[in-house]
């Protein structure tokens, strides 16, 4: 009995230590300090993007933020949610028939792969078109295939965002083309991406740099798709070897937007930058932030449930639920400043 009590106390003490160490990060989320103030106090590099965040992909810990709760237009990083929901709720082997709305409902000057009304394409190929070439008509068609209509899919997007804790996100379409009522934040996009990365299939689609769509019923030529995220291309000046995937976005109203994730030194980080003058700035900002965190932080596992017997872990968890509102913590990872 005494041994169990000691285990309970130890569990609680380590959990409280973890929570207390995370408090400054939570405070930083809502800070109104200017970017220059934040950079001056933390030593992080100066960045140009209006909003940014670095989040630990395992724990959700915020390591860096700049205006991360300020609403921004997301542009095509919207497609992270679209792809994730398609994988979660759709049939990758199903055949999509392009509707008139999907083909002609988009701005033809925006990103597309020239799919035509009545053309048939697999759900899998449509996802590659979305994640590599940012094909707007493919995103619309995926929405119709999964939910029966664009409107139903958008409702699913918003319901999912809300369930993930996104408080400043509202979607009106599946592709991110500009709409004044289509917005999110860097923080919310990090939450959405963290959830998407729990899907192995999503990670596989997002990590591809090249894909071929075979001839269809209305097109005799193979479509060659290449990755639009230049941090993943070895021949690019922005190539970042640790980058495992991501999604770019740009509209005149949104500016440059980018979500990327990278893994190095046993750390997996999500970086979101929004409101940049161009995508080149997204790349340089993201690389600078990644380099700083990977060079100055390390991931420390504080404890795991298996280190305590079930009775002790359950009792301690109930205490944390009552006093801190914490859900099951399981294995806790903390990114620690090495300096």
Ranges and model annotations:
Residues 6-7, 66, 79, 247:
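A general lysine-centric signal
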Residues 166-167, 178-339:
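Domain-terminus/edge residues, biased toward the C-terminal soluble/receptor-binding domains
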Residues 20, 92, 301-304:
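Residues in and immediately flanking transmembrane alpha helices
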Residues 2-27:
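Sec-dependent N-terminal signal peptides of Gram-positive bacterial secreted proteins and lipoproteins
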Residues 25-187, 191-200:
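Active-site-adjacent loops and short helices of periplasmic peptidoglycan-processing enzymes
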């Amino acid at each position: 009995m005494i041994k169990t009590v000691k285990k309970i106390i130890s569990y609680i003490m380590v959990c409280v230590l973890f929570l207390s160490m995370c408090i400054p990060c939570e405070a930083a989320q809502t800070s109104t300090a200017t970017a220059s103030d934040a950079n001056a106090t933390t030593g992080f590099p100066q960045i140009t993007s209006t909003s940014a965040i670095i989040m630990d992909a395992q724990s959700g810990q915020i390591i860096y933020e700049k205006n991360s709760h300020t609403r921004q237009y997301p542009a095509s990083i919207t497609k992270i949610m679209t792809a994730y929901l398609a994988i979660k709720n759709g049939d990758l082997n199903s055949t999509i028939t392009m509707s008139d709305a999907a083909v002609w409902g988009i701005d033809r000057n925006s990103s597309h792969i020239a799919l035509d009304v009545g053309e048939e394409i697999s759900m899998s190929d449509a996802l590659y078109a979305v994640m590599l070439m940012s094909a707007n008509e493919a995103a619309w068609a995926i929405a119709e295939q999964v939910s029966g209509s664009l409107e139903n899919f958008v409702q699913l997007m918003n319901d999912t965002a809300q369930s993930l804790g996104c408080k400043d996100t509202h979607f009106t379409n599946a592709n991110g083309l500009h709409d004044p009522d289509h917005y999110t934040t860097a923080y919310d996009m990090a939450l959405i991406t963290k959830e998407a990365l729990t899907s192995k299939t999503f990670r596989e689609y997002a990590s591809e740099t090249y894909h071929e769509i075979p001839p269809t019923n209305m097109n005799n030529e193979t479509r060659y798709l290449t990755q639009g995220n230049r941090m993943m291309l070895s021949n690019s000046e922005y190539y970042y070897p640790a980058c495992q995937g991501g999604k770019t976005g740009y509209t005149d109203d949104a500016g440059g937007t980018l979500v990327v994730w990278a893994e190095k030194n046993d750390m997996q980080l999500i970086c979101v930058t929004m409101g940049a003058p161009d995508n080149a700035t997204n790349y340089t900002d993201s690389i600078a932030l990644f380099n700083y965190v990977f060079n100055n932080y390390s991931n420390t596992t504080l404890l795991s449930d298996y280190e305590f017997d079930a009775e002790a872990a359950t009792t301690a968890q109930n205490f944390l639920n009552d006093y801190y509102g914490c859900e099951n913590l399981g294995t806790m990872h903390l990114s620690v400043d090495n300096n």
